[in-house]
Amino acid sequence: MEEERIYTIPLRDVTNKSPTTKRAPRAMRAIRDFLKKHMKSDIVKLDNSINEKVWERSLNKIPAKVRVKVVKEGDVVKATLIE
């Protein structure tokens, strides 16, 4: 059974709590951790569009929030960017 949800993932905490040279990698980890927590699964696959959105303005200027569409198929969670 497939389960589909739309989330707005806040990344403001990542911006405020990390040095400028580590913001994008930490944002990617924060997205993955958010989806693990909310979808209750350990296997999370992020689409390349999410990666491009976070890294769009370089390492230290990440977006404040990201909207993603998440589909859970069994134990696997797949996320794609909305916009």
Swiss-Prot record:
Does the record's keyword annotation contain Metal-binding? no
Q: Does the keyword Ribosomal protein apply?
A: yes
Q: Which InterPro entries does UniProt cross-reference here?
A: Ribosomal_eL31, Ribosomal_eL31_CS, Ribosomal_eL31_dom_sf
PROSITE patterns, from UniProt?
RIBOSOMAL_L31E (PS01144)
Q: Which UniProt keywords apply?
A: Ribonucleoprotein, Ribosomal protein
* One term under GO cellular component: cytosolic large ribosomal subunit
* A Pfam family recorded for this sequence: Ribosomal_L31e
Biological process (GO) annotations held by this record are:
cytoplasmic translation
Which NCBIfam families does the UniProt entry name for this protein?
PRK01192.1-1
Protein name (record): Large ribosomal subunit protein eL31
